[in-house]
C-alpha cells in the first residue's frame, strides 16, 4: 500500500466537481475564486487591503454555497461570485463580469 500525502487544508472536506464550459470537470479550488475576485478588485483601484478583505468574504460565501452541492457548473460559480462581489463593490463586480467576455 502506497503512502498518500495528506493535505491538511483539504483533509476531511468534501471534494466538489466543477463542470467547465467545455464539459470537462475539475475539483473546486477556493484559491481560484479568491484570485479572480482579487484581480477584479485591484483593477477597480481598490487597495491591497480592501481587495484582500472583500475577497476573503466573497470566497468564503461562494465556498459555503458550493459545499451544499454535489457538482456545479463554472457558470453558476461565475454568477454567485458576481452577486457576492456586487454586495461590496459595484465596479469590481462589473470588471469581473465583463472580463470573462473579453478573455
Predicted regions and their residues:
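Long, C-terminal-biased catalytic regions of enzyme "large/alpha" subunits
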Residues: 1-103
